[in-house]
Amino acid sequence: MSLIARIALALLLAVVQVPAAFALDDAPASVVQELVPFSSDEGLARLARSDAKVDFPVLANQFEAESNGAFCGPTSAAIVLNAVRGRSPDLPRDHSRLHPEDLQYIPSAYDPALPRFTQDNVISKGQKTRAQVLGEPMTINGKKIQDFGYQARQLDEMLRANGLTTRLTIVDDSKSEQDIRTELIENLKRRGDYVIISYLRKAVGQQGGGHISPLGAYDALSDSFLVLDVNPTSAGWVWMPTATLVKGMRTFDTVENRGYILIETH
């Protein structure tokens, strides 16, 4: 094999082995309906006229960005958990972001860590470990594989382990676009109920692999949902047409399709 051929093969293998959760994926995204940035005039107008946006102010108040490319699931979980149970006196205190030197001048009786869920402390309640989220091989269907991030069903289990009542929907061919639209709109019109979606970025016209984020609102005039993307480094909040969103969820992830999780508090 020539030197040029060996270099080409090495580059090909390097691309193939990049985990989906971290891949930037510069390949052309599939052709889909246009995504409208939330920060645009049109994006703000859609929120203003929406009649399915009661979740938005609560989620926006609790919003945080993921700290790494595999934590979109835990970050979405933390945002929703704080929206549901924020200011409860029994919330966990995450000390992982405080270093010993940070505490040297703080009175010993005072705990500076705020009582709230974080993308770090929500993981420990679920079956999937932090190491597995970050690529430690795990057994799935009898095979040892790396499974970065969270599949929809794994995230649903973690949310339940943290005390939420959920309903998982896997978006396969049996689930119609109209049924999905109706369920999501009904949830977004009820206070205290939330939606987390799992979708493939490439399928919705963005660069990247699988991703998870909450939904914030629905605009009937444009038939689009507001995706509160937890990775602003890759993409900001966008209005995503229903057909595009369904296309992104109706994609395969390891053992089954992606989908959405309805968090029910009533």
How would you label these PLM feature ranges?
Residues 6, 49-56, 164-171:
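Short, charged, low-hydrophobicity "junction" segments
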Residues 102-210, 216-259:
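Conserved active-site-adjacent core of cysteine acyl-enzyme catalytic domains
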Residues 6-16:
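Bacterial N-terminal signal peptides
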Residues 21-148:
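Active-site-adjacent structural segments surrounding the nucleophilic cysteine of cysteine proteases
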Residues 263-266:
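Short beta-strand-to-coil "C-cap" segments at the C-terminal boundary of structured domains/repeats
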Residues 1-2:
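N-terminal secretory signal peptides that target proteins for export/translocation
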